Amino acid sequence: MFKKFDEKENVSNCIQLKTSVIKGIKNQLLEQFPGIEPWLNQIMPKKDPVKIVRCHEHIEILTVNGELLFFRQREGPFYPTLRLLHKYPFILPHQQVDKGAIKFVLSGANIMCPGLTSPGAKLYPAAVDTIVAIMAEGKQHALCVGVMKMSAEDIEKVNKGIGIENIHYLNDGLWHMKTYK
């Protein structure tokens, strides 16, 4: 989604949100990420300006004080940015890839089933369409945000094809877009 993303070319406009819209977004975030509730006011303080940065391909990035927090495509689900995920790693369930998959994931490739079932990888129970943080064997922080394309059970059984779709990864266009004022 952000492989060829460039802040100067892809951002079309930025709008400050009304309090009622912010409340609706907070409710949607609580519904989507129940574990975020104790930290939501810390992540999105009440008095700080919340803006939506509109980009090409119907991508919207939610910012607070210029810090990129969440993004979504069209009216779809919100995904946390990796910068937010590094501060609050418990927001998403984790899946771990083996060392051999790291370079492919960091170049934007989807996570294949063998990268999740081999020694060094850890596959935790998750349903289809669950948003997950992809961790790497021997590393502390997430290297990618993805969406389960198969359930964890099916990944173990089939062990072929795409297991997790790579949505946002370290060093992609969104990662390089540090803040937006």
From Swiss-Prot:
UniProt-recorded Gene Ontology molecular function terms: ribosomal small subunit binding; RNA cap binding; translation initiation factor activity
The organism's place on the tree of life at top rank: Eukaryota
GO CC annotation terms, alphabetical: cytoplasm
CDD domains for the chain: MCT1_N, PUA_MCTS-1-like
GO biological process: DNA damage response; ribosome disassembly; translation reinitiation
Subunit structure, as described in the record: Interacts (via PUA domain) with DENR; the complex regulates translation reinitiation.
Record-stated family: Belongs to the MCTS1 family.
Protein name per its UniProtKB record: Malignant T-cell-amplified sequence 1
Species name: Mus musculus (Mouse)
This protein's encoding gene: Mcts1
